[in-house]
């Protein structure tokens, strides 16, 4: 069978790979759609320190169960599923604490191990999440939105609080959805007007175009002297890492869900004077997936707002090149593999 492969930075191709067969405790999944993640873009650009080449990308998965390996129960061939794409060790202190998403030895599909940009994948049965009542295309949104929902949970965001969301890519939009779901007021910030329009459609109370507006002054105008209780950084840039601690109000919480690609310097007195809390947020957990699924069932229009483009398998490479050339022009690109499986 064929697979999309990032051969080296800036180069993608279609390669032949063996058809996998499920072993004991494993499930074969026929892939319907796969979303391109920001980590796939950084891998394409040669900026992802976690990847080795060549690599089949893809961990935002929509599919159907094709076959069950021996000893698998509770699942049915043909049912729609998404996949928890993180493989934790089960032994490190994070795993023992019940926080497998923070596993020291985690391997994510499409990053440290081969991904899902291929007609069939085989995964352990415990990684399968059956989903009904959500469009097949939109199943590919569950994983990235869950990363945003997890960041909201890490923030401990409460009803009535104000959160500034730095970045309106799909992770930032997941933060926006998760925050609105909790009854918070969202102020979304981005450089791209189109992404800000999506944030408003998903419930952001206010948006700030950082390309034309003094973000600090506008946040101050919108929140007064108190400032926001929470700032969630979903860009992964040194400027927004610093901006997060500058914007948050006294005794507030900063959550980093992006990570800067270079060391960041801070005016460290801000940490003390504001007595702020700074928290990291990594990936997501099954309960975050389940919350996103519930939200998509209740709000079936989310996919229409978030997905910018659906491309066939053969155009996956050119689509990545287009995203690389104009990252602000797309929120989410989804690759359709259904025709490939026909």
Predicted segments, located by residue:
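Glycine-rich cofactor phosphate-binding loops and adjacent beta1-alpha1 units
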Residues: 155, 197, 202-277, 317, ...
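Mid-domain Rossmann-like dinucleotide-binding core that forms the NAD(H)/NADP(H) cofactor-binding site
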Residues: 134-212, 217
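Conserved beta-strand positions in the Rossmann-like core of class I SAM-dependent methyltransferases
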Residues: 66, 187, 255
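NAD(P)H dinucleotide-binding glycine-rich loop of Rossmann-like/cofactor-binding domains
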Residues: 89-166
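C-terminal hydrophobic helical "lid"/dimerization subdomain
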Residues: 242-246, 286-342
């Amino acid at each position: 069978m064929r697979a999309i492969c990032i051969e080296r930075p800036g180069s993608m191709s279609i390669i032949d790979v063996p058809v996998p067969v499920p072993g004991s405790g494993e499930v074969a999944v026929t892939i319907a759609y796969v979303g391109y993640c920001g980590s796939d873009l950084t891998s394409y650009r040669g900026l992802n320190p976690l990847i080795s080449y060549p690599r089949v990308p893809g961990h935002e998965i929509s599919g159907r169960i094709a076959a069950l390996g021996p000893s698998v129960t509770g699942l049915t061939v043909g049912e729609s599923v998404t996949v928890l794409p993180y493989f934790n060790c089960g032994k490190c202190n994070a795993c023992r604490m019940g926080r497998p998403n923070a596993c020291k030895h985690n391997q994510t599909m499409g990053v440290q191990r081969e991904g899902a940009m291929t007609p069939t994948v085989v995964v352990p049965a415990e990684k399968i999440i059956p989903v009904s009542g959500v469009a097949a295309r939109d199943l590919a949104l569950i994983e990235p939105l869950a990363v945003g929902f997890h960041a909201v949970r890490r923030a401990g965001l409460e009803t009535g609080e104000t959160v500034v969301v730095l970045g309106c890519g799909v992770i930032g939009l997941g933060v926006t959805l998760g925050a609105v779901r909790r009854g918070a007021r969202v102020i979304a910030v981005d450089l791209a007007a189109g992404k800000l329009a999506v944030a408003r459609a998903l419930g952001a109370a206010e948006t700030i175009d950082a390309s034309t507006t003094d973000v600090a002054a506008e946040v101050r105008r919108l929140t007064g002297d108190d400032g926001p209780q929470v700032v969630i950084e979903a860009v992964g840039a040194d400027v927004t890492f610093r901006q997060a601690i500058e914007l948050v109000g006294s005794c507030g919480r900063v959550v980093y869900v992006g990570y800067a690609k270079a060391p960041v310097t801070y005016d460290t007195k801000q940490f003390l004077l504001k007595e702020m809390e700074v928290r990291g947020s990594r990936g997501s957990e099954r309960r975050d997936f389940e919350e996103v699924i519930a939200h998509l069932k209740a709000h079936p229009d989310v996919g229409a707002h978030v997905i910018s483009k659906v491309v066939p398998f053969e155009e996956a490479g050119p689509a990545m090149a287009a995203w690389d050339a104009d990252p602000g022009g797309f929120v989410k690109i989804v690759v359709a593999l259904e025709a490939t499986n026909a």
